[in-house]
A protein has these predicted regions:
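N-terminal loops that bind phosphate or other acidic moieties
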Residues: 1-202
Length: 202
């Protein structure tokens, strides 16, 4: 909807550009580079919230050389927690809810699997199930017949990460992605900018 996708994309590109210019080697260093760049380059409400996810993830991976499946799952939980704390009045049925369920899915799978791909697959599955339920949580979404745009953007990001982990290939910008017919349109539930504690820099 509107500019949600553009704002999220620009925020992620800030991190991608920072990594391209960085000599970060460890999981902790990469996470810190990404979080710092996103905090500086966040655009719009969705970008600010996304930057807070990675702020939490960075804290979870701080000082770590590598990242195990469990550490990854726990970092996702810390990311979700950080995003919730950044918003004074969190609204369910938004990207916040989707991120929370993604983290739950990851942590559940990490209890029985040490394979980070399996953990991310479970996280993505749970996230997509939750995304489809967002219209039931937000009347405006149900009335419009759409899912939450921020949540959809987060799922596209995670699906891209999963694709790269499984194939070693990066999805090029501009490539078409296939969404279910019922999700052709998305809408971002409005989150008042004033309710976000950590704003972005311009």
């Amino acid at each position: 909807d509107g500019d949600t996708g553009t704002n999220m994309s620009m925020t992620i590109m800030a991190a991608a550009n920072a990594l391209a210019d960085s000599d970060a080697q460890t999981a902790g260093e990469v996470a810190e580079t990404v979080a710092s760049a996103m905090l500086r380059g966040a655009r719009g409400n969705s970008g600010v919230i996304l930057s807070q996810f990675f702020r939490g993830i960075s804290k979870g991976l701080k000082g770590k050389e590598t990242c195990t499946a469990k550490e990854f799952a726990d970092a996702l939980k810390m990311g979700s927690d950080a995003a919730y704390k950044a918003v004074m009045n969190p609204t369910e049925g938004t990207i916040l809810t989707v991120s929370k369920e993604v983290a739950i899915g990851a942590q559940m799978k990490a209890e029985t699997s040490k394979d980070i791909i399996e953990v991310l697959e479970c996280a993505v599955d749970r996230g997509n199930i939750t995304l489809k339920r967002t219209p039931e949580m937000v009347p405006a979404l149900k009335q419009a017949g759409v899912v939450d745009a921020g949540g959809q953007g987060w799922m596209y990001f995670l699906e891209g990460a999963l694709h790269t982990l499984k194939t070693g290939e990066v999805i090029e910008s501009g490539m078409e992605t296939q969404a279910p017919a019922t999700e052709k349109n998305q809408a971002q539930k409005s989150i008042d900018t004033s309710s976000i504690k950590y704003m972005y820099c311009t």
